[in-house]
């Protein structure tokens, strides 16, 4: 019986899972939309929702708690400066999961996880900035 099993192991060790979700949460915060497998998306949702709740609090302790979960300080800065104020009036439900078919290689169910009311220009913004910098260098 699987009673009281709190989360999926995803065939990884605890440290590997922790690093996986830290990286995925950072990517979601940076791009505001990512495509991944459905079980990973379902496990990522509560992690990101709790990070947004920390960003809504906005105090120093909340910032340090978020920094302990995320890999880069740029993610923490965007979380507290952009996403926290954006969802200040919303009581939960910051993330949406949409099914996206099956992966070609192994038929794994795929999903798109994104922020509700996301900034559509955020996805690919780093690539656009890098291309603009390359054009300026020429």
UniProtKB/Swiss-Prot annotation:
Gene Ontology CC terms: cytosolic large ribosomal subunit
MF GO annotations: structural constituent of ribosome
Residue ranges the record marks as coiled coil: none
Top-level taxon of the source organism: Bacteria
Position of the signal peptide: none
PANTHER family: LARGE RIBOSOMAL SUBUNIT PROTEIN BL17M, RIBOSOMAL PROTEIN L17
Quaternary structure annotation from Swiss-Prot or TrEMBL: Part of the 50S ribosomal subunit. Contacts protein L32.
Name this protein carries in UniProt: Large ribosomal subunit protein bL17
Organism name: Dinoroseobacter shibae (strain DSM 16493 / NCIMB 14021 / DFL 12)
